[in-house]
Amino acid sequence: IRRYFPNAMIVADRFHVIRLLNQFCLQTYQQIDPEMKYQRGLLAALRTNPNNLTVKRLNRRERYLQQQPVIAAIYYFKQRLHRLLMRKHRTAKQCTRLIPLFLKLVASLKESPFDSLKTLGKTLYQWREEVVRMWRFTKNNGITEGFHRKMKLIQRRAYGFRNFENYRLRVKVLCS
């Protein structure tokens, strides 16, 4: 990449960063409360944006968080980091103000007593420049990933067919 695009800056994909955050937080929740994995509605309530929850799920989540103060602390920390990571279209000056807050949150993750949160903190720290660039630049490779997914589905459906021209035609129809 550096050879062909010497001035290019790598920007982390917001979808993957948020997915990583959710994945490691859910691992920590399940480490604290192993019975949680059998309560699917509760897991969904902890994963879903609070603005998108029904009143019933919101109440269920709040009751659970009152019973589990450690999980509640991690959950509210995750929400704070999530809100910070979801910011878009920031100027360079605004980004400069947000960086210390981001680094402070990452440092507290690295000092966590839970291994999965430590790992998340180390990962975010290693990718800090790419993650911070998300606030300023919003272009990503989501379209390319979508096309690759469609192409894999076509291949799966057409397993055993040998006509490459037919495959190429299907890809052109579905991806244009």
PLM region spans:
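Short alpha-helix plus adjacent loop in nuclease-associated cores
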Residues: V17-Y38
